[in-house]
């Protein structure tokens, strides 16, 4: 029997604290060196750090990201009893069993081809230029809120083919996807976070239905026409794939961009090299 009291990190790990937000490196280094696998009771979860440990966990067939496989998990709801957010998570790549995960990945792979990504590179560059034009030339501005929190979601919206005037609806969907799985939210906070998910899913389903009627050479049309062993993606599966892209590519990209700027400002020699 493992004594989890000796493996807990609650006494020093608080990802919401100002100290951690200002400089997470010392805490992360302590986790990696002293607590590579440890219990974090605040999340009712185990934390795994270090590339090898993480890789070993991901490859270990005894472990799964499917919460419903846990022996103490409550009975899974029937689809008709799920709310919009629960239906979205029901098909999310992050929580599927191995066989379904591989099936969806194989079907989705053509939509991420180099040809389509090259098309998107042009759109992404245009989005960034337009954003800087909107900001203008102030003496100072907040990169995190003005760029990092906006561009990644807009880039994914552009990838999916969301009309520019519908970006706010898609942004609310992205916010719900990222915030809705946060284990530290209260039920009230979670309900507020996912409030925009139904409208966002309605928008996606309308767009998917339109693309089914009038396909073109783009990301969403490629998802629709993808076929493997006679199977195609359903609307819910496509919505879940887009949700997975949002979960993996909006919040994380925003954090990465902010840390990149922080690192450059902390290393003037590297910033000078970049300016060359």
Each language-model region and where it sits:
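Cytochrome P450
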Residues: 1-276
């Amino acid at each position: 029997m493992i004594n989890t009291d000796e493996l807990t990190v609650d006494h020093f790990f608080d990802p919401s604290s100002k100290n951690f937000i200002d400089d997470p490196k010392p805490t992360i280094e302590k986790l990696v060196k002293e607590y590579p696998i440890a219990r974090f009771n605040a999340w009712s979860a185990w934390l795994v750090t270090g590339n090898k440990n993480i890789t070993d966990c991901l490859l270990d067939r005894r472990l799964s990201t499917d919460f419903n496989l846990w022996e103490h998990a409550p009975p899974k709801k029937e689809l008709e009893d799920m709310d919009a957010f629960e239906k979205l998570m029901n098909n999310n790549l992050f929580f599927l069993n191995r066989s379904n995960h591989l099936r969806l990945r194989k079907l989705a792979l053509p939509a991420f081809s180099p040809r389509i990504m090259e098309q998107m590179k042009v759109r992404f560059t245009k989005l960034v230029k337009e954003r800087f034009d909107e900001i203008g030339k102030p003496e100072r501005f907040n990169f995190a809120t003005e760029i990092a929190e906006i561009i990644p979601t807009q880039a994914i919206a552009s990838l999916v083919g969301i009309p520019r005037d519908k970006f706010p609806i898609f942004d609310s969907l992205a916010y719900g996807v990222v915030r809705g799985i946060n284990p530290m939210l209260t039920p009230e906070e979670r309900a507020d976070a996912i409030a925009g998910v139904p409208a966002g899913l309605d928008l996606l389903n309308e767009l998917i239905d339109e693309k089914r009627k009038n396909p073109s050479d783009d990301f969403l049309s490629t998802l629709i026409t993808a076929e493997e062993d006679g199977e195609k993606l359903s609307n819910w599966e496509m919505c879940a794939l887009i949700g997975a892209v949002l979960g993996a590519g909006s919040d994380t990209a925003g954090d990465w961009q902010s840390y990149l700027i922080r690192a450059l400002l902390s290393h003037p020699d590297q910033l000078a090299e970049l300016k060359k």
